């Protein structure tokens, strides 16, 4: 029984959680001493601290997280996304309608799965229970600041620290233990660089800060209990709880886990609760002992239910049948056989737990080949167009297959893989052989010759320059087509077998900088043709009428010869010298096709054609790429998510009626799909990590460690978290998880004025500071400094779009959805609506460029 099957059985055995099953993947816990609140599947739940059945508190498409009980136990503050922005909300302890407290800038990077983490994370309450402290980022940058807002709402006040993160007040509320750097969401365990965090103590009265940990490891999330500050640290590799004594200044290790990290602990000042391996635990500081909290709950699993989905928006590849009447399309891991015009759309795989891709029709039209990982490894499968069960063509593959291609005679399939091999498979016998392997790197753009006897490809040499080769499959001999001094790419044989067409970077047209005495080379590529045989003339040679008549006679003889003998003739000696360059402007060229008379190619995101006889270039299709059917009579055009079929050859494609993709409906079983994504991610790192020793990690054991969590994933964010934890074990930077398909609320961008405001006693809002901008730059415009606006610091905003600002406790509640929208402000020199004048501005969606610009300008003043 293979590993994939074992994992599937494990998944099947835990897919349905009943009332008595213990819940797992419970996140971001907090306690009031009798209850525990946590996030599960994006919603908040509350359960007894000693364990038991959990009660659901929130239900929303957004993610509710980082709940914190108020000191009196009556309220819960949390971070939520109810109104299209990630903000601070408040609900009663037993649940109820959320009250929005904050109105802040809408960041594009504030998802739970992003390396920056969500914005406006609730950190704690002030000990008197009057205010809630949260961490805010004014933009997508690395810096966070601590802010405080009343539980009754109003305007937030900044805590006067340069930066701040997770924090905890001393019992008397006079000091604050805090972090400065935000790395809690990075997929990078065991980090020891300059951004490793420490625990600091801030004394507002003395205006002093003290570093109490000061070591190279991560020391994060302080919890102040009596004379001790608890925190988590990876100084002994696995993240555990440590404690620092304020009086003795000694640090002691409290928990001793060696498997999963302790994650996101919090405390009410008496008890600590935390995550470990997807479960919740409580720690008694008096005894230093931890106890698991067993929690059960019921959930409708709304984000993990099976469903049927239209998948046209998830299209990844498409190819024409030889006659152009049908297409094979891959989308969301399924392979579809669809009609070019009218007919039945068939999902020929229907495997929600596997990723099928790169579907290709055989040139003889009898079979469809595709790559699938249904066995736990990527293998090539065949599906007869007559129906029946799919046939597994390859067996026991040991790495990721990149791409496949049929031989023109439909007898073989060639594929490339992550071990930098070209492998050929015989369709009849299923025998496969390694054609070659390149120790310098992968092969690119492998293509067959028309007679199936040769292949061409690109590979890098020791100098990292890409060279094009041709290779004879029978003799095993390789011959260079280009020199090693120029990057060359995208080689294809012409269909008549006479030429090799490719791109090469040989145009050196330096662009000089206007501010520095430097230059750069851009748009170096050109279209080249190699005459494969010595006796093949250049298609660009001039000719007169007599020569043309003689050539026509020769061509007629050659056509008869080609009909009986389709062999491609290549004379290797002197081949790199038999190159011509088409008279085209230097640029970026690829996706070549040629019948020997014309050359089609992609340039500037459009398909173009060059007539060799007329020496003329024409645009075939604007903004579209082309793929030609095996019979060379139809072409498929890709434009955005739309597909079009046109007759071929053509010099002008008619892209009027796109192919109907709406009938592509696939069964989605999220539990199986997420298991596949987890498995493929693990294999991607196994096969592609830059060091074979995986930084010393036991990669097989790490997979087993985190695979047990996957069946408990109830949202895509759960899966992303598990994958992030797994790849973080490699202790390397820039290992990110793309969010994938996440269902969330519609974003409503906050309008910003490029100013700092405060509320007057009368209820109106005073402009305390206007951020100067640069009028000439759209990126640096400051709305209140536009010529003719006439707004000054000290002025009051008395109304926005006719609504009095005195009627709201936070002026930004009137600016929600106003980013880059014309907005009317009523401005007065006094805190009164009487005598106010009206101005129209366009609020910003991001103030960070203004803050950065002012920082730069201030530094210039200091230095000049």
PLM regions and their residue ranges:
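A short helix->beta-strand "capping" segment at the edge of beta-propeller domains
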Residues: 21-26, 52-54, 299-315, 568-585
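Blade-terminus and WD-like Trp-Asp/Gly-His loop motifs, strongest in beta-propeller folds
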Residues: 30-33, 67-75, 123-131, 167-175, ...
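Extended, small/polar residue-biased N-terminal targeting/export presequences
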Residues: 711-766, 833-859
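C-terminal, low-ordered peptide segments at domain boundaries
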Residues: 294, 298-303, 651-673, 777-782, ...
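PDZ/PDZ-like domain segments forming the peptide/carboxylate-binding groove
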Residues: 747-807
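A flexible loop/linker signature enriched in serine peptidases of the S9 family
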Residues: 21, 39-45, 60-64, 77-89, ...
